[in-house]
Amino acid sequence: MKYLHLIFASLFRKKTRTVLTMLSIFSAFLLFGLLSAVSALFSSSGTGEVATTRLVTQARTSFTVSLPMSMLPELEAIPGVKAVSWRQWFGAVYDDSPNNVFGFAVPPARWAAMFPEWVMPEEQKKAFQDTRTGIVVGKLAAERWGWKIGDKLPLSSNIFPQKNGSKDWQFDIVGIFDGADENYRRQTSNQVYINFDYFDEANQFGSGRAGIFNVQVESPSLMESVAAAIDARFLNSANET
């Protein structure tokens, strides 16, 4: 401890160097968080047979750029599209530990229909639809932190504060989902899903936008043509994909 003053003196001897170093460290952690989000996003989009008819549609410029919900009916009208869902990365933090929870805001009914690999009793699916502040949590995550249905779950968002400026959110646990097989079960260790309507109304940055759209096509043979049709539909618009 007797050298502490020397450390601080050295740090602030060249303030520009210190600031740039701190910014570099911050950027590294930010990049890690964003890339972890991308990994969770595509992992939760499915693997194997269940994912052979699902596309992820995102903004062409960057996965961090959101898309307007006005695109929804246009996506649904594209030939070969069977169903469309969406999600927004929430940036959840539990118990002051960053990157330990991957939280997404989703439309409950569409999410449950498009992602059957997440197994949950029907009454819990309905509770998720009916509870504005509802959240469903992965089985392994619930076991890890001792979460139970009926609990209040406090989460912070490092991206989306509420309209009152607070980064602290509180949700009601209404369901616990498991994976359809061992691969999906492993992914329940850190995933949670919140009701999109509540998030959309309460977040400070406005409503009516999704991070990505999940598009289910009618047949695996249509994947390439539907993807091309989506890109063509929004080409030269403000929302290129």
Predicted regions and their residues:
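Diglycine-centered glycine-rich loop/turn motifs
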Residues: 111-137, 142-143, 148-155, 183
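Hydrophobic, regular-secondary-structure patches
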Residues: 26-104, 108, 120-131, 143, ...
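N-terminal Sec/SRP start-transfer signal
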Residues: 1-31
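Extracytoplasmic
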Residues: 52-54, 70, 96-101, 130-132, ...
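Mechanotransmission and gating elements of multispan inner-membrane complexes involved in transport
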Residues: 78, 98, 141, 159-241
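Soluble periplasmic/extracytoplasmic beta-strand elements of cell-envelope proteins
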Residues: 54-58, 85, 100-105, 134-136, ...
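Alpha-helical membrane and juxtamembrane elements of multi-pass inner-membrane transport
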Residues: 1-5, 9, 40, 55, ...
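Amphipathic alpha-helical segments that mediate coupling or scaffolding at interfaces
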Residues: 10-11, 45, 216, 233
